[in-house]
Amino acid sequence: MEQKICVIGFSGGQDSTTLAVWAKKRFKKVCLVGFDYAQKHSVELECAQKIASLLQLPYEIIPLDFLENITRSALFKNSNDLIGHSHAQNKDLPNSFVPNRNAIFITLLHSYAQKLGASNIALGVSQADFSGYPDCKEDFIKSIEHALNLGSNTAIKILTPLMFLNKAQEFQMAKDLGVLDLVIKETHTCYQGERKILHAYGYGCDKCPACQLRKKGFEEFQANKK
């Protein structure tokens, strides 16, 4: 397999955008792949498309809108659940969790990597600031990498350079990569789809768990600069 192709799971958020720039500096070819899983706000996909264009990287969207028919999450556009509560199917998880979402995403990215002859997949997951999602943890990523390679007789690596970075460290990484302004102004994190108010850390409602996590990280990043 060609060693210089990397397929990235891309949402247009802080994590995957920082990851895309990191990968662009390391691989000859980088391909961004997003997923339309009937998420609550189309702004996420719109931001991803714009960022891909700014970075001059190819971007594919895979439709997965059937997901809301087979499972439950407050992130689905037809959900009446208010974000910030426990998940209806598992009280130990937040209701923004989409069961098996990352497993499905990674499986499709693995198939796409095989089609391209790529030996690397990169994900912007982190267990330092993982919002309570078990499918962002290193043990899960290593397990699914092993299972998918066994099932396809391949040796595709799943790279997770942000795995042990918190949001403050990710802001520092974006600065070191020269894209801090891009990350602040163009990426989307807010669960409410708010793009009208630009805060110091980026656009958002300033209230949802995603905004609070990003805000806290930016404040820590700023404090560490002093």
From Swiss-Prot:
Residues reported in the UniProt entry to bind ATP: 10-20
GO MF, one annotated term: ligase activity, forming carbon-nitrogen bonds
Keyword set, alphabetical order: ATP-binding, Ligase, Metal-binding, Nucleotide-binding, Queuosine biosynthesis, Zinc
Known cofactor(s): Zn(2+)
Catalytic activity as recorded in UniProt: 7-carboxy-7-deazaguanine + NH4(+) + ATP = 7-cyano-7-deazaguanine + ADP + phosphate + H2O + H(+)
E.C. designation(s): 6.3.4.20
Pathway given in the UniProt record: Purine metabolism; 7-cyano-7-deazaguanine biosynthesis
The keyword Ion transport is assigned to this record: no
Listed name of the protein: 7-cyano-7-deazaguanine synthase
Organism the protein comes from: Helicobacter pylori (strain ATCC 700392 / 26695)
Taxonomic classification: Bacteria, Pseudomonadati, Campylobacterota, Epsilonproteobacteria, Campylobacterales
Record gene name: queC
